[in-house]
From Swiss-Prot:
Signal peptide stretch: 1-33
An annotated Gene Ontology molecular function: neurexin family protein binding
Protein name: Leucine-rich repeat transmembrane neuronal protein 2
Subunit record text: Interacts with DLG4. Interacts with neurexin NRXN1; interaction is mediated by heparan sulfate glycan modification on neurexin.
LRRCT domain boundaries: 311-362
Gene of this entry: LRRTM2
Phylogenetic placement of the source organism: Eukaryota, Metazoa, Chordata, Craniata, Vertebrata
Length: 516
């Protein structure tokens, strides 16, 4: 009976003892052993700025996160983190790491984030990241990498973000990203890239944002981006690009933003933007453009924001296509687009110069009150919500102002047709003048014959006077030479000439004619 009554009391005791033993076994896994100089929060260990020269050995093997930022670690040995199989993120940025041995991250199968930025890494073995099959974010920016092994990122099929900013990369190996099928963000900015391989981005079928700014690219062939079927944003600013081409006909329907600011672009293939039917933001400030063909502008049908300031715009007849397009543009531009040449237009807004100097032939402008211009307190530029974008001025308008200005511009395209039309117009004017003169003469003869007879009689009288004067002069000369002996004019008017051949009597008549 005694044993029967003790058993119910002993069962809870046995359960408590078993639970206590399990807790004791799980203490290491729960992160109770915190390394010296580190701050521990549950299973996350923060050992930043503690002067570590190597990874501390006392780190708990069950930790999920380890931060060793801002220390003095110079080298990562082979199997350095092999026993930390539970790590999901590892931060090693802002150290002095220059050497990473092969398989240094072996065993970190659950690692999702690895930060190695701001170190001195100049080389990475091709097996460095092989076993990081769950890695999603890799940051290698601000190092000294000059080249990458073609198989360096092999096996990283879950990688979504890759930072390679501010290294010394000169080329991108073909098929470097072939196995990165999930990559959505790639930053290759601030390197020394001079050209892009045709298949350099093969495999990046999910890439949405690509950064190539601050490199040394001189020419861009958009056919090299053919395999980036999901790309949304492309940054190419501050390179040395002089022209844009497209080596083949294709449609890049996903691209919505293209930044080409700060290059040396002088020429653009007429069909480049036809491959980007959904492009919404195009920034080409601070280049060397002096004009844009109307075919290029007409292909920008979906554009909502454009940047064209800081170029070498020539405000002559060549600017009419751009002025016409700007006049009907429904979107916005953040900075003024000013003339660069000739001298008398330098510094003038393009649209102001076109109107003020009458640069475009047959220009017509209609101004109506339709839209509202206001100052956005969160931005530096003035938004214009209107049916056109004619620049009225750079005066600051209060947020309460309700000034509404809209212009409708019509600019013909400057081409050979204008010259031909002018020649035809001039020829027609000359022909009209000629026929008009003939018509006036004909009418005069039909309508005013007395006047014409008087004019004719006056002309005949004048001719007779001239003839008589010449006859007198001739006779005077002949009398001095010998045939004439005597000349005696009478008081009545007739005169007699006596010579060796006979006698001639000439009497002056009232109508001034002479009979012999």
């Amino acid at each position: 009976m005694g044993l029967h009554f003790k058993w119910p009391l002993g069962a809870p005791m046995l359960a408590a003892i078993y639970a206590m033993s399990m807790v004791l076994k799980m203490l290491p896994a729960l992160g109770m052993a915190c390394p010296p100089k580190c701050r521990c929060e549950k299973l996350l260990f923060y050992c930043d700025s503690q002067g570590f020269h190597s990874v501390p050995n006392a780190t708990d093997k069950g930790s999920l996160g380890l931060s060793l930022r801002h220390n003095h670690i110079t080298e990562l040995e082979r199997d350095q983190f092999a026993s930390f199989s539970q790590l999901t993120w590892l931060h090693l940025d802002h150290n002095q790491i220059s050497t990473v041995k092969e398989d240094a991250f072996q065993g970190l199968y659950k690692l999702k984030e690895l930060i190695l930025s701001s170190n001195k890494i100049f080389y990475l073995p091709n097996t460095t990241f092989t076993q990081l099959i769950n890695l999603q974010n890799l940051d290698l920016s601000f190092n000294q990498l000059s080249s990458l092994h073609p198989e360096l990122f092999y096996g990283l099929r879950k990688l979504q973000t890759l930072h390679l900013r501010s290294n010394s990369l000169r080329t991108i190996p073909v098929r470097l990203f072939w196995d990165c099928r999930s990559l959505e963000f790639l930053d290759l900015s601030t390197n020394r890239l001079r050209s892009l391989a045709r298949n350099g981005f093969a495999g990046l079928i999910k890439l949405r944002e690509l950064h190539l700014e601050h490199n040394q690219l001189t020419k861009i062939n958009f056919a090299h981006f053919l395999r980036l079927s999901s790309l949304h944003t492309l940054f190419l600013q501050w390179n040395k690009i002089s022209n844009l081409t497209c080596g083949m006909e294709w449609t890049w329907g996903t691209l919505e933003k293209l930044d080409l600011t700060g290059n040396e672009i002088k020429a653009i293939d007429l069909t480049v933007f036809e491959t980007m039917p959904n492009l919404k933001i195009l920034l080409m400030d601070n280049n060397k453009l002096n004009s844009l063909d109307s075919k290029i502008l007409n292909s920008l049908r979906s554009l909502t924001t454009v940047g064209l300031s800081g170029n070498l715009w020539e405000c002559s007849a060549r600017i009419c296509a751009l002025a016409s397009w700007l006049g009907s543009f429904q979107g916005r531009w953040e900075h003024s687009i000013l003339c660069h040449s000739p001298d008398h237009t330098q510094g003038e807004d393009i649209l102001d110069a076109v109107h003020g100097f009458q640069l475009c032939w047959n220009l017509s402008t209609t101004v109506t009150v339709m839209a509202t211009t206001y100052r956005d307190p969160t931005t530096e530029y003035t938004k214009r919500i209107s049916s056109s974008s004619y620049h009225v001025g750079d005066k600051e308008i209060p947020t309460t102002a309700g000034i509404a200005v809209t212009t409708e511009e019509h600019f013909p395209e400057p081409d050979n047709a204008i010259f031909t039309q002018r020649v035809i117009t001039g020829t027609m004017a000359l022909l009209f003048s000629f026929f008009f003169i003939i018509f006036i003469v004909f009418i005069s003869r039909k309508c005013c014959p007395p006047t014409l007879r008087r004019i004719r009689q006056c002309s005949m009288v004048q001719n007779h006077r001239q003839l008589r004067s010449q006859t007198r002069l001739h006779m005077s000369n002949m009398s001095d030479q010998g045939p004439y002996n005597e000349y005696e004019p009478t008081h009545e008017g007739p005169f007699i000439i006596i010579n060796g051949y006979g006698q001639c009597k000439c009497q002056q008549l009232p109508y001034k004619e002479c009979e012999v």
